[in-house]
Amino acid sequence: MPSLTPKTQDNSIRENVYRVIKENIAALQLAPGTTVSTQELAAKLQVSRTPVREAFIRLQKEDLVEITPQKGTMVSRIDLTRAEKERFIRESLETAILPLFLQNCTEPDLKELELLIEKQKACFTGLKPLEFIALDNQFHQRFFELAGQDLSWDVVASTNPHYNRLRVLTVQNAATFDGAVRQHEVMMDQIRHRDIDALRRELTDHVRKIIAEKNVLLQLYPDYFATAQQEMKL
């Protein structure tokens, strides 16, 4: 876990502690089901325990940690039912903005998106799944920005703690990693041809694919999930 640069303002310290812990949970550096110590995190981050406790309270509201009196704080396990609901939000918003995105997308924008895909390929070659996730986010975020729907992206980015951790798990697998890059290449061809129907279908499949692979993930990482029985509900 990275350390924090000391700040002069208490609010800056609080925000940085919250951000670092949240990023480590999202990246599975703090694995689902892991018990986390306020004292140990405070020491690692070189801060007092107060901002760590405050961060835990905020993260509990986001369903990323569970705080149990007398027992401590645990990183929330991945809830597949919640992940499916988060997927629905993303799919609904992202498919809705496609007409505006295609309308506003220019040749320089296309070049920018293609460059992001090239960087994603480099991540695949270098086996850097977390860097790929960041580039994947940038790729899809540009859809929203070019559509003039930045707020919708903020909604997607702030309401996907369980779905996002599924994404991180899926790209640990080389075949899935490569498949995600190839889907982006297909999307780019559809964007260039302004084929909105094909793009909508491909994007829908792209977003749902992670949920579709839940059974494999349950077998590989059973301790990361709230209950192994949840796959029967989806």
Question: Where would I find each of the regions flagged by the language model?
Answer:
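Short alpha-helical transmembrane interface motifs in multi-pass membrane proteins
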Residues: 79-80, 166-170
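C-terminal regulatory/effector modules of DNA-binding transcriptional regulators
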Residues: 176-234
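Short linear motifs at protein or domain termini
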Residues: 1-103, 211-234
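Mobile beta-alpha loop/short-helix "lid" or hinge segments that flank ligand
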Residues: 61-66, 159-161, 176-177
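Conserved amphipathic alpha-helical segments that form helical-bundle/coiled-coil interaction surfaces
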Residues: 86, 107-168, 182-189, 197-209
